[in-house]
Amino acid sequence: MPLVKRNIDPRHLCHTALPRGIKNELECVTNISLANIIRQLSSLSKYAEDIFGELFNEAHSFSFRVNSLQERVDRLSVSVTQLDPKEEELSLQDITMRKAFRSSTIQDQQLFDRKTLPIPLQETYDVCEQPPPLNILTPYRDDGKEGLKFYTNPSYFFDLWKEKMLQDTEDKRKEKRKQKQKNLDRPHEPEKVPRAPHDRRREWQKLAQGPELAEDDANLLHKHIEVANGPASHFETRPQTYVDHMDGSYSLSALPFSQMSELLTRAEERVLVRPHEPPPPPPMHGAGDAKPIPTCISSATGLIENRPQSPATGRTPVFVSPTPPPPPPPLPSALSTSSLRASMTSTPPPPVPPPPPPPATALQAPAVPPPPAPLQIAPGVLHPAPPPIAPPLVQPSPPVARAAPVCETVPVHPLPQGEVQGLPPPPPPPPLPPPGIRPSSPVTVTALAHPPSGLHPTPSTAPGPHVPLMPPSPPSQVIPASEPKRHPSTLPVISDARSVLLEAIRKGIQLRKVEEQREQEAKHERIENDVATILSRRIAVEYSDSEDDSEFDEVDWLE
């Protein structure tokens, strides 16, 4: 049904019924036709005025927009051509705080609304019959709907279309969200490396070159296959004759004994010693080779020292502790694997620092012994880390006052080397008391009085009171007799300026969030009957990678 905007009356000039009693009918028809022509001319003039008036209004609005655009272009041209780079007209803060430009042009939407109804259509609408007065029943409805909308609702089709568009947009957003969640929950599968293709023709060409050249090429090919496909054997899928041919010429069993031993030696040198494994146990001697191992307690540390007779040095100091020693440190960088293997085969137990000088030199050159040096690693020797220092057997006191009586109560008696070797192994010493218990019996002190020869100088060369046998405890471990009471600090209270600043920052953040929320709500209100916005929103959701790219996303504010 076409919608007539302008209707010219009358349509027919001469189609009129003549009244009765007219004698001159021709003159009457002429007058009626002339009057209808005048009426039509008046209608045409009226509609012409409407048409040209609309054209004038459109031209006026167009000229106004062009003039405003020209003024803006002139201002920009002046700013661009006459801009002084030395003078900063706008600060960086003003530029960042300025909002993005938004056009204020109102797009033509809802063309068939009551507000956009033209005057000729309004006149035609006024001629029509009015609907029944159903709005009178609206206050009596419980659902709040207008009563007239059940009879006539101009926005029915638009509301139906809008609801369908918004529902489709929401469904697509939910589908994308589910797909994204599914991708996050799915574990990341490692990429599978394809197996290298097998070139049989190349292998036969290498075999045709001769057994000498084929041997090196086959070794190189085997290395490449192991690098590409891992240690899994690739030759199992080949014919059995080719495997036999390869194994027969240069297999390990076909090598002479000298080459085989050399390969095994190289393989042993490639073995890395793990730093966290304990050292190998000493070899077990036979019943006839068993030698007594003297045991002593060091006067400096109170630790038990077993000194087995080594064939190389005569004695090898080894620390023995009631508790298992900590794991050994890693190998130094300067230590080679060959020297390590040689030292492990020659010296079974892992020794510590080099042995002290023999007793003869100690008797001939009496001197004050230096303080115990830190443990050093001999070249080619692995040893466990030194055990922790045992707690002192006497009550803690200043180190200078403690050194003299300790030196006096520990006499040193040198023993000949033959007696040391002929003595039977002494019984195991009693365990050391815990740190918190003070020893009540002098058993441990008497055990300290007979160390083996060669460990300490003679009584004539004993160190004086100024040389402490035990390392002095650090000052941090000295417990003061009386601790001063701690009083509450009398520092000035921090000013409230910092808290006020933090409160202002929190309020600013909260205000910013409220402003963003209001802007978002204003966008949602703008969607109400905006056809272009609804369509653009749907297109944005369809073609975006994520649901967050949409300009209007109410999920962040509604959830």
From Swiss-Prot:
Residues 497-514 form the WH2 domain. One of its GO terms (molecular function) is protein kinase A binding. Residues 182-202 have a biased composition (Basic and acidic residues). Pfam families: WH2. It is found in: Cytoplasm, Cytoskeleton; Synapse; Cell junction, Focal adhesion. The keyword Phosphoprotein applies. Highly expressed in brain. Lowly expressed in testis, ovary, colon, kidney, pancreas, thymus, small intestine and peripheral blood. It is linked to Neurodevelopmental disorder with absent language and variable seizures: A disorder characterized by neurodevelopmental abnormalities, including moderate to profound intellectual disability, with autistic features, seizures, severe impairments in speech, and gross motor delay. Component of the WAVE1 complex composed of ABI2, CYFIP1 or CYFIP2, BRK1, NCKAP1 and WASF1/WAVE1. Within the complex, a heterodimer containing NCKAP1 and CYFIP1 interacts with a heterotrimer formed by WAVE1, ABI2 and BRK1. CYFIP2 binds to activated RAC1 which causes the complex to dissociate, releasing activated WASF1. The complex can also be activated by NCK1. Binds actin and the Arp2/3 complex. Interacts with BAIAP2. Interacts with SHANK3; the interaction mediates the association of SHANK3 with the WAVE1 complex. Interacts with ABI1 (via N-terminus). This is Actin-binding protein WASF1. It comes from Homo sapiens.
